[in-house]
């Protein structure tokens, strides 16, 4: 079984954002992070999950931990109605971040994933680590733009 922790961060919303993931597999730990200009927190949360799932090549069962209720509920519940309603939400408006949701949905259908929500800024060391990495990625981008 593979465990994945993901997080996204945004300095301003919209603003400069960072994403990170951490993968625990066979006793090893891998983490990656990145950043983006002019983004939102939700886009970074989705990007973290997408990049983590794209990184994993094995067909093992994955437990993905996110502190984003938006990502967890979106992929496990809301997306069913969005697809039925041609990517419209309950207010009949276009689903925000549709392009990212489509990517995540494809990855979700290709892998065996258990989605779990974890409380942010709490006692989970792995979640705290990806939170820090995502924030640092966004902060580095801002710092580099002033150098």
Predicted regions located by residue number:
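RNase H-like nuclease fold core
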Residues: 1-43, 47, 54-60, 132, ...
């Amino acid at each position: 079984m593979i465990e994945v922790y993901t997080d996204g961060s945004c300095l301003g919303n919209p603003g400069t954002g960072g994403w990170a993931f951490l993968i625990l597999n066979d006793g090893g730990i891998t983490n990656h992070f990145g950043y983006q200009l002019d983004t939102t927190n939700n886009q970074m949360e989705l990007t973290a999950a997408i990049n983590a799932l794209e990184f994993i090549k094995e067909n093992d069962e994955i437990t993905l931990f996110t502190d984003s209720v938006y990502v967890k509920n979106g992929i496990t519940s809301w997306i069913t109605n969005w697809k039925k309603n041609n990517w419209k939400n309950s207010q009949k408006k276009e689903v925000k971040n549709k392009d990212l949701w489509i990517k995540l949905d494809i990855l979700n259908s290709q892998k065996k994933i258990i989605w779990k929500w974890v409380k942010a800024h709490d006692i989970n060391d792995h979640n705290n680590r990806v939170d820090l990495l995502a924030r640092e990625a966004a902060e580095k981008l801002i710092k580099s733009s002033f150098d």
